[in-house]
Amino acid sequence: MGYVKWSYDTLDKFCHDVFRKFGFDEDETEIIKDVLLTADLYGIESHGMQRMVRYDKGIERGTIHPDAKPEVVFETPVSAVIDGHDGMGQIISHFAMEKAIEKAKKTGVGFVSVRNSNHFGIAGYYAEMASKQGLLGMACTNSEAIMVPTFGRKAMLGSNPIAVAMSAEPYPFLFDCSTTVVTRGKLEMYNKSGKPLPKGWALDANGQESTDAPDVLANIVGKKGGGIMPLGGNKEASGSHKGYGYGMLCEIFSSIFSMGVTSDKCCTFKDRNGICHGFAAIDPAIFGNAEDIKAHFSEFLETLRQSPKAEGVERIYTHGEKEILAEKERRENGIPVNDNTMVELANLCNYLKMDFGAYFEDYELPKDSKFFSGNY
């Protein structure tokens, strides 16, 4: 399967109309599609358009409640706990980070922990909400268990990504990564492409290394054992315990502080997923002059970029640069979407009684795709 490129405006219009069909109001729709398309613009395909079908299935199963509103259930001047009541993760998370930012602007710091939510997209989106207002932003989330702990053979933690963002010149700093070697979404992309997984990513039900994407994904869904390795692989000598530990830090900020559902139990209920998030915003001004701190940080980032390069390498990047470059290129030349994802979107349109061809003119569906059903 190959890729086809679409303009940002084409995908924006499509996402807008789909989420309105799902029952979200205009403001909610704007938030959801902005999170999704930001992922695609940044080159994080696993968390972009290809997630739409999973969201629809969540709504159909009743694990995502489109009409739910986030509620503050505990609060201090510097912290809050929010119950998402099983609503859309992007809407809940946007609300939560706004709360953290509000507190940071008043007191210097804001910490918010969320329970009873759903998949929220890319963590970096919410960290950037704070950095764009001159604050340091942090976002993390637990998820359905996919990480096999060091020395284990059963998934017990989610991919548990952590993102940190801070303003700098000429490029802002944005670090966003899972605490597993890769995310579940990356496995889904390999499954769609039909390619074997790279070695060092996943384990089968017996705890042995596997390159079989369909089998690993089926085991994750069926809770049969196996899953994805922590950062550092599956051996302590290679640093597996470090990724495992970072995953636990995320779990503390999300499910533990909120008294929510831990990763091993997420997505095991019939009527909810119970996913939890953590957010923080910190005003650099609590440490001194904010502009001086920004300049100092910017200088160090430039020092990193100008440091000696390995032989044959032309450039050293700081975190967030590649996303900026990807966004520029994709806004100019189009966003690539996998053919199998296009088939899923066509099936979704049939189900929602939307005209797929009205959005994607002249696109011919590959009917031989294993993802083609004709009606979803």
Regions found by a protein language model. Name each.
Residues 2-14, 252, 257, 262-376:
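Catalytic-core signal marking the mid-to-C-terminal active-site face
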Residues 79-169, 177-178:
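A generic, well-ordered mixed alpha/beta core segment in the N-terminal half of proteins
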Residues 196-266:
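Secondary-shell segments that build the walls of catalytic and ion/ligand-binding clefts
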Residues 1-8, 13-32, 37-38, 45-66, ...:
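Acidic, glycine/proline-rich low-complexity segments that act as flexible tails and inter-domain linkers
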Residues 147-221:
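Phosphate/diphosphate-binding glycine-rich loops and adjacent basic-rich segments that engage nucleotide
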Residues 73-83, 94-110, 211-231:
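Residues forming anionic-ligand binding surfaces in small-molecule and nucleic-acid pockets
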Residues 47-101:
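Active-site cofactor/substrate anionic-group-binding motifs, chiefly glycine-
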